[in-house]
Amino acid sequence: MRLNAKSRLFAIRRNSIHELGIVVHISKTLEELAQENNITDIRRVTLQIGKVSGIVPEYLVDCWQYYKKKVPLIDNSTLEYEWIEAITICNECKKTYDTIQYGRECPYCKSEHTVLLQGNECLIKEIEAE
C-alpha cells in the first residue's frame, strides 16, 4: 500500500478531529487578538489544559503543526501547554478533592452531590509575539 503525504495528514486529522477543531478555534481567537493589538507574528502560544477536558495534548500539537502552515500569523509558532488539575467540590460537606483520584463520589462524606470546579477547560495563558 502506498501512502502519500496527503493521506497521512488525513489520518492524523481523522484520529484527532476534536483537537483540530480546538486548534482552529484558537487560531481564530489569535487572529482577532493580533488585529486588535497590531501583531503580525506569533512565536509561541501557551495553553492551560484541564486534566479531564478530553483533550489529548499529543494530538493537539500534531494538529497545530498541520494547521499553522495555513495561517501566516502562526506559521513560525510553537505550541506549549500546562495542565490544570481537576478539582471537585462536594455540595454536602463543602470540601474539595482531586477528581481524578476519587471521581464523582466525595471521599469525605461519600455524597455524589458534587460539582467539578476546574479541570475541563482549555485556556490561552500566554502569547509571545513580535
Regions found by a protein language model. Give the residues of each.
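Long, charged N-terminal interaction/targeting segments
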Residues: 2-77
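Short metal-binding segments enriched for Cys and/or His
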Residues: 114-126
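Short, flexible, mixed-charge glycine/proline-rich loop motifs
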Residues: 78-86, 95-100
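Short cysteine-rich clusters marking metal-coordination/redox-active sites
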Residues: 90-93, 106-109
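Short functional micro-motifs and their immediate structural scaffolds
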Residues: 98, 111-115
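Cys/His-enriched microdomains
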Residues: 88, 104, 122
